[in-house]
Amino acid sequence: MTAALATAWGADVVGCMHVPDSPDIFRATCTDLAQQSDVLVTSGGVSAGAFDVVKESLDDMTFTKVAMQPGKPQGFGRFRDTVFLGFPGNPVSCYVSAQLFLRPLLRRMAGADTNHTVVQIPAGSNWRSPLERTQFVPAMIIDGAVIPTHVQAGGSHLVASLAATTALAVAVSYTHLRAH
């Protein structure tokens, strides 16, 4: 999915692969890819779990928690001379992360405007954002109202919801949106 998004945004994707949960193999793969890439993007392995190989293998990168949902765990830095972005493994979290971090990076590298188009549209259904996190909800616009593309506005594993997504609805921390 991330490779397809990057391609749609004008990047030449050099490789897209699954790497075993081995720190040595993962780091060697990153070293090989970094020699032929300007940007290295990973998905999965960036939180605090026992099998977070990305975090273990690239301990010189920054891994942090961002006050956002979905996509709270993130990684970034420079691996060799290559920009590194480490996204969560949940598909919706990865999609949101790519929209917020990879797309502007690629646009900046191409010399294009990095601003997202922002419009205010009434909510077409009710939802609450979590306390202390900005929520980015994959959504669609129907009859002038924004509606989440999945039934529960928050399931980062609901990849099928992305097929209908045409926008990201943004609700700042602790916002209660009511349908109009």
Where are these regions (language model features)?
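Short intrinsically disordered, low-complexity coil segments enriched in acidic
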Residues: 1-8, 136, 176-180
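Phosphate-binding glycine-rich loops and their immediate beta-loop-alpha structural context
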Residues: 1-42
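Loop/helix-junction capping segments adjacent to catalytic residues or to phosphate/diphosphate-binding pockets
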Residues: 23-24, 48, 95
